[in-house]
Design a protein with these regions (language model features):
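Short, contiguous alpha-helical
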Residues: 1-41, 83-123
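Acidic/histidine-rich alpha-helical segments that form the ligand environment
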Residues: 41-83, 93-99
Length: 123
């Protein structure tokens, strides 16, 4: 069975924002928010209906989006490069396109999950 949930998607997107903008583009050694060597899917597996977990997830996502926005604002050259885990270089423009793809994919997941919960369909 899948562990996908709306909260898991929020946590996952906080992880994705952090990975691409802090770790890859800014070169920070920022710790993972949820992932561990034992559980690469901790962003989904740890998404439980606890108000503190929900609040932390939204706070983390907002913080990571704010960092990404500030990074992009300070980096006018879209050909600026960052280094991925495997040592390859990636340009900021490619990261931005990738983030659009990530959000499009996961917003679609959220739309389907919402429909399963209450029958409402996206507009």
């Amino acid at each position: 069975p899948s562990t996908m949930s709306l909260l898991g998607l929020v946590r996952h997107m906080a992880h994705v924002e952090r990975s691409w903008f802090r770790r890859v583009m800014a070169g920070q050694d920022a710790p993972y928010l949820y992932r561990t060597p034992e559980d690469r899917d901790a962003d989904f597996n740890g998404a439980v209906a606890d108000p503190a977990v929900v609040e932390q997830a939204w706070r983390a996502w907002r913080d990571e989006v704010a960092f990404a926005e500030q990074y992009v604002d300070r980096t006018p050259d879209l050909s600026t490069t960052g280094t991925t885990r495997d040592g390859s270089e990636v340009q900021l423009r490619d990261v931005l396109v990738h983030m659009i793809e990530e959000y499009a994919r996961h917003c679609g997941h959220a739309d389907l999950l919402r429909e399963c919960i209450d029958g409402r369909v996206g507009q």
